[in-house]
Structures are given as C-alpha cells and as structure tokens.
Regions:
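Non-heme di-metal
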Residues: 1-128
C-alpha cells in the first residue's frame, strides 16, 4: 500500500502540482495544459514501456495493453488538440500562453520524477 512517508518527493510534488492546478480556478488554463500534455506524451511513453517489457522477455499477450495504447493514444492526443486546445485558443488567443505554461510545468515535474525513478532503480540494480 503506498504511503506518503515512502513516496519520493518528486512524485508528491507532481501530484500536488496537478491537484493545485485543477482545484484553483485562477489556474484553469494551466490545468488544461498540464492535462493536455499528458495526452500528447502518452503514445511515446506507453510505446517505451512496451519496448522495455519486450526487452525483459515479457510475452506479447502481457504487453498487449501497452501496444494497444501506443496506437490508440495517438488518436486521443490528436482529438485533445482538435476538440479542446484549438477551440479554446481560437476563442481566446490569450489563453495559449497559460496553457503552454501548464504543459511545461507538468513536463518539468514529470522529468524530475523520471530522473528520480531512474536513479532509484539504478541503485537497486547495482546492489543486486
């Protein structure tokens, strides 16, 4: 069971950032950008997970979810831009900078998480 006391601070910061953006009206545009960038980066992320699982010898059946989402999430990301981002920016071009800011905030938080996870996992592998 996950506990705050055993969760790396970078993951807590990411979670708190997403919650903070989503629960504060003044950060509506940033929240949309942060959520949108998750959709936009999902296809490559799940593709990389599938490649890693394959490298570890995990069967095609066990990788099916990730293989499916690597393809499906491409259409989701296009739909996110077409149906959410583009109409908002067309209606109010000033929101574009705030949406981009939210996307960058989420990307930086995610990068810090992945860097920490990588460092933690390397330490665990090195001590095996």
């Amino acid at each position: 069971q996950p506990r705050i006391s055993t969760t790396v601070w970078e993951a807590l910061a990411l979670s708190n950032t997403m919650i903070g953006l989503a629960t504060t009206r003044r950060y509506t545009w940033q929240s949309i950008g942060a959520l949108g960038v998750i959709e936009l980066t999902a296809p490559n992320r799940v593709k990389q997970v599938s490649i890693g699982l394959k490298r570890l010898g995990i069967s095609r059946e066990m990788r099916a979810y990730f293989d499916l989402h690597a393809a499906l999430d491409v259409s989701h990301s296009r739909a996110w831009v077409r149906e959410i981002i583009r109409p908002l920016v067309d209606a109010d071009p000033a929101c574009a900078a705030h949406i981009a800011e939210g996307a960058l905030i989420r990307l930086v938080c995610g990068e810090r998480c992945f860097d920490r996870y990588s460092a933690e996992l390397q330490c665990q592998v090195a001590t095996c």
